[in-house]
Amino acid sequence: MSDTEQELQRVIRRHYREKRELQAHIQTLKASVPKNDKGRRKQMLADISRLEAEMEQRHKQELEKFGENPDSSVDSVTADLEKMNLENMPPRPPKAQKRRDRRAHQERRHQERMPAAQAEQLAANRREEEEKVAAILGAKNLEMKTIPADGHCMYRAIQDQLVFSVTIESLRYRTAYYMRKHIDDFLPFFTEPEAGNFYTREDFLRYCDDIVHNASWGGQLELRALSHVLQTPIEVVQANSPTIVIGEEYTRKPVTLVYLHYACDFGEHYNSVKPIEVAGAFGGMAPRLF
């Protein structure tokens, strides 16, 4: 096999992995927005459509750089990859799920023609949320610090405030490990987003695998696990709800996260915080809060 063919196969394998990661991210997005919040669901579906189109276009451009039609190679490598991952793939979706997917696709197409008034309302909600959060944080002499919206935002916001060096991969692994070791403390809180059925132990273990291997978004249950892992309280500031404190049994200075509903195009998002910089003070990075 030539070097060009080997490189092509590496690219195709990466594309396959990226597609699976995007699908996992999409499922998390769908579960994160309440069904009765039509405005946010429409925005979320439009974001999903854009993400899919951007990935498809990028993959196409990368394959075209090889100077030939790679369709046959793509089919061959993809078939091999699917065979390798067959045992780890979830079961095929039932007919009801397929109908929901079709409706979601139709809604995405409708969302592409969202009236300007709705876009203006979303922007207004975003500004209002940011102003309220700024007031809450200002009372603590803090201000919001933007974290990338890449599916790792919760873990990145925590990483940003720790005095010791730790990778996102390590935080995800330690979160999943703790949840597996204390499955009875977490399992009762997990239900299927659509049907509402409680997770089986197998469902829960697959969920923990996603924490480690995918850019799955985290929530309060993952924060509970992280507070135990770090032995540190974690407080979550929101614009329209009281601040939530997780891990109050620990005495260290808390890590503070900001939970946003409108600041990110993908749906809910976590940001970090930092001390407010005083004008005229000596430069340098603000101290971390751990």
Curated annotation (Swiss-Prot):
Residues 95-108 have a biased composition (Basic residues). GO terms for molecular function: cysteine-type deubiquitinase activity. It is an enzyme of class 3 (hydrolase). It catalyses: Thiol-dependent hydrolysis of ester, thioester, amide, peptide and isopeptide bonds formed by the C-terminal Gly of ubiquitin (a 76-residue protein attached to proteins as an intracellular targeting signal). Residues 259-269 are annotated as: His-loop. It comes from the Eukaryota. Signal peptide: none annotated. One of its GO terms (biological process) is protein K33-linked deubiquitination. The keyword Protease applies. Residues 211-221 are annotated as: Variable-loop. InterPro entries: OTU_dom (IPR003323), OTU_OTUD6 (IPR049772), Papain-like_cys_pep_sf (IPR038765), Peptidase_C85-like (IPR050704). Keywords: Hydrolase, Protease, Thiol protease, Ubl conjugation pathway. Disulfide bonds: none annotated. The active site is at 150, 153 (nucleophile), 269. Its EC number is 3.4.19.12. Deubiquitinating enzyme that hydrolyzes 'Lys-27'-, 'Lys-29'- and 'Lys-33'-linked polyubiquitin chains. Also able to hydrolyze 'Lys-11'-linked ubiquitin chains. This is OTU domain-containing protein 6A. It comes from Mus musculus.
